[in-house]
A protein has these predicted regions:
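Active-site acidic catalytic loop and adjacent metal/ATP-binding pocket
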Residues: 34-46, 50-54, 165-207
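A general structural signal marking secondary-structure boundaries and capping sites
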Residues: 21, 82, 125-133, 169, ...
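ATP/Mg2+ or Mg2+-diphosphate-binding catalytic cores
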Residues: 258-284
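Short, surface-exposed acidic
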Residues: 23-29, 235-245
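An alpha-helical support segment within catalytic cores of ATP-dependent transferases
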Residues: 8-25, 130-180, 184, 242, ...
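Start-of-helix signal in alpha-solenoid helical-repeat scaffolds, especially tetratricopeptide repeats
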Residues: 68, 247-251
């Protein structure tokens, strides 16, 4: 009985989601996809045979430091730059987005050759940096402090772990449009198309590149190849002192740790615990 009740609730939730779409999309049916760590994702199939991608964002974006209005602003610009899939319907207040369907796999499932990845991502960054700089800023110190303040329980080991980093001084000399989550799951095909712009804001490009290195499992040489390819495409260095990305590696680890702690409080599970353990180890 419990299984039937759960299935009925799921069907009702999907019907309610379809009802929020304008015609003709509400006449379709939904197929749940493997969701990310924060969103619910679906393939929307229409009677015509066409498909679309439907994303329902996290219900508490403020807790995760997400600004929906800025996400939508950057997304619209990214479509114009050929970075993001065309959007047919959006409700920034709830994080609902209906996009073109893309059959190309993400880089987790089918990564391009490793030697090509730095240049491909340099192309993403050069186009991204042509967009207007958002008014909302994601500065690493303030962003991490917001995450920490929202923790219901601070682990006993955290104060000693974070002390050295918080006593340091991070670069704060360049602010550009940033995606802030260019991990392999958010890159589709060889173009690549970039999805999940939730954490988009003005940010330091060095943090963006440091985040790429960590989430792609790169060595320093691949990060340096990306930076060199960027300078060649852009016709010069970024900012007055370059990317300075090495200085942001511990900030990527720290923010990743706090994010995973926040998510684990809300929904404990092995995926979040693995991220906690990994980032804690990197900071030790």
């Amino acid at each position: 009985m419990a299984g039937k009740s759960s299935e009925a609730s799921l069907v009702a939730a999907e019907r309610a989601l379809l009802a929020r779409l304008p015609p003709p999309w509400r006449s379709g049916w939904l197929e749940p996809l493997a969701s990310g760590l924060t969103n619910c994702n679906y393939r929307l199939r229409l009677p015509s045979g066409r498909s679309h991608f439907l994303r329902q964002g996290h219900p508490d974006p403020v807790r995760l430091g997400i600004d929906r209005a800025t996400e939508w602003q950057l997304y619209q610009g990214a479509v114009g730059q050929g970075l993001a899939l065309p959007c047919h319907h959006s409700d920034p207040a709830t994080g609902l987005m209906l996009l073109d369907w893309c059959d190309e796999p993400n880089w987790l499932a089918a990564p391009p050759p490793a030697a090509l990845q730095p240049a491909l991502l340099a192309g993403v960054l050069t186009r991204l940096h042509r967009l207007p700089v958002p008014s909302v800023v994601m500065a690493v110190r303030a962003h991490s402090a917001g995450y920490r303040a929202r923790l219901a329980r601070v682990p006993a080991w955290l104060p000693a772990l974070e002390r050295g980093l918080l006593a340091s001084r991070e670069p704060a000399d360049c602010w550009l449009p940033c995606h802030h989550d260019l991990n392999p799951a958010n890159l589709l095909g060889s173009r690549p198309w970039v999805i999940d712009w939730e954490y988009g804001a003005a940010g330091h490009p060095g943090f963006e590149v440091a985040s790429i290195q960590r989430t792609h499992g790169w060595q320093d040489a691949q990060r340096e190849a990306l930076e060199q390819a960027y300078c060649e495409r852009a016709g010069g260095p970024v900012g007055p002192r370059g990317f300075q990305s090495r200085a942001f590696l511990p900030w990527v680890d720290y923010i990743g740790l706090l994010w995973a702690l926040l998510m684990a409080e809300q929904q404990p599970g092995p995926d979040y615990q693995a991220l906690i353990d990994l980032n804690r180890q990197r900071l030790e």
